[in-house]
Amino acid sequence: ASMLPLDKCFKASFCGDDSLIYLPKGLEYPDIQATANLVWNFEAKLFRKKYGYFCGKYIIHHANGCIVYPDPLKLISKLGNKSLVGYEHVEEFRISLLDVAHSLFNGAYFHLLDDAIHELFPNAGGCSFVINCLCKYLSDKRLFRSLYIDVSK
């Protein structure tokens, strides 16, 4: 962030090594990667994207404001959690994921989420069906439990 003119930015978020900075169109920063390498000895990436991505979430701007959707691929990968020990732990995990995924129950802007995912993964298909399935499993305690076998016995 210290390498960019934050006085020109109109929004910025920082968390650990992740940042999202909105700058006016047309500003050029061609040497940011090389400068970061020389100053801090790490690799910095500057992306010019239509859709924001910050801390595993897509920031989708629309005519009435914006909505923040969690990354569906990250949520699906979390379903493979191997540290769960029994069905009580599975239920706690479901409630936690349900809390993270709450905005996915609003499908009004899935078409824009599709566009945002395609911006990062050009060969990805539409996400509506997958998200609806994910929401169905997260909102049904018994259905979610059926994804796991009880290894505590």
From Swiss-Prot:
Catalytic activity entry: RNA(n) + a ribonucleoside 5'-triphosphate = RNA(n+1) + diphosphate
Select a single GO molecular function from the record's annotations and give it: RNA-directed RNA polymerase activity
Write down the InterPro entries for this protein, in alphabetical order: DNA/RNA_pol_sf, RNA-dep_RNA_pol_alsuvir
Leading EC class:
transferase
- GO BP annotations listed: DNA-templated transcription
Look up the EC number in the record and give it. 2.7.7.48
Sorted UniProt keywords: Nucleotidyltransferase, RNA-directed RNA polymerase, Transferase
**Role description:** The replicase large subunit is an RNA-dependent RNA polymerase active in viral RNA replication.
* Family named by the database record: Belongs to the tobamovirus RNA-directed RNA polymerase family.
**Name the UniProt record assigns to this protein:** Replicase large subunit
The source organism is Cucumber green mottle mosaic virus (strain watermelon W) (CGMMV)
